[in-house]
C-alpha cells in the first residue's frame, strides 16, 4: 500500500467550498492587510487555545524576529538556541546582531536539555529560545527556573506545537513571548505564509503590536523602529475556516501516534518518548535508527514516504560555521540528526495506511 509522507490535498479538498467562499468574501471586501478576517482569527485563536491575546503575523519567522527585538538582544549578547530544530529558531538573534549559542537536546524528547542550557550560559547570555519540537513541550519547569535565576528573556517557539500543553498549561504561557507558524504543513496551516505572536505580558503584547506595523503610533507617525510583519487577510480567512477543525485533527494525530507506539517493534529503533509532563500534538513522528538510510530505502520500496527532519543540526550549518561550535561539540544533536527519520502522520491517514507503515517498519532487517 502506498502511504505518502504528507498529502495536503486531502484536507484542502474537504474544505474547498468553505475556504473559497471565505476567500471570495475577503477579496470582495478588499480586506488584504490585517483587517476583520485577521482580527476574527486572533480572537478565535486566543479563546480556543487559552491565550490572553494573539497577533497575526506574516510568517512563523516574523514573531521570532519581533520577540528578539523586544528582548533587546544586541551585538554583544548571546541567545541560547537548541541545536536540533529548524533554522528559523536562530534567525531572530541573528537578525538583531546577537550571537546564537547552540545547546544540546535530550534523546527521545528532542527538546532542549536543561543541563545543557545551564552549561551554555555565560555573562553575555541575555536570552533563550525554547523549541517545543515536533509537538512535544520542553521541560519548562526546569528551563524557566534556570532562566529566572539568570534573568533571561525567554522566547517559546511553538511553531510545531499549537494546542500542546505542559502539565495542563498551554505552551507559550511560560516565557516572555511565544511564536507560532501557520506554514501549510503545520498542524494548523494556512494557504501560504502566516504566524502569530502571543505574550502573557500586556506591555510586550502592545510593543509587538506596534512593531508589526512599522512602529506606527498613528498614520505616518512612527514612535519606535518596527517592520512589516502583518498577516494578510487571505490567510486570516483560511485560518478561520480551519481553526474549528484543529481539535479533531489533533485527536487524530494522537491516535495515529498511539498506534505507532503500540505497534512498532524494530530492534535498534528509538521511538518518541512520552514523558508525563507534556501533551504532544505530534507534528512529526520521528524515530531514530543506527541504519537510518537503509531503513528509509526499505520503506521507500514498500511505498512508505518519509522525511529527514533535520539532517544537519544548526551548529554544523555553513552559515553558523564562524561561531566555532564544530563537529563533536553537541553529541546528542549530532547523533539524532544522523539517525532520525520521520514517518507519515497527518489526520487524513487511514488506520489501514498506519498499519501498513507499521508492518513495513517491522519488516526491516
Feature-to-residue mapping (PLM):
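N-terminal "arm"/small-domain region of PLP-dependent enzymes with the aminotransferase-like
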Residues: 1-31, 36
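PLP-dependent aminotransferase class I/II
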Residues: 9, 21, 36-44, 48-54, ...
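Phosphate-binding glycine-rich loop
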Residues: 29-78, 92-96, 102-104, 169
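Hydrophobic residues in well-ordered beta-strands that form the structural core
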Residues: 75, 81, 102, 154-156, ...
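Conserved coil-to-alpha-helix start sites within the AMP-binding
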Residues: 85-90
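Helix C-cap/helix->beta junction micro-motif
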Residues: 96, 149-150, 302
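Short beta-strand->loop structural element characteristic of the AMP-binding/adenylate-forming
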Residues: 99-109, 307
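Active-site phosphate-binding strand-loop segment of PLP-dependent enzymes
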Residues: 108-190, 196-198, 342
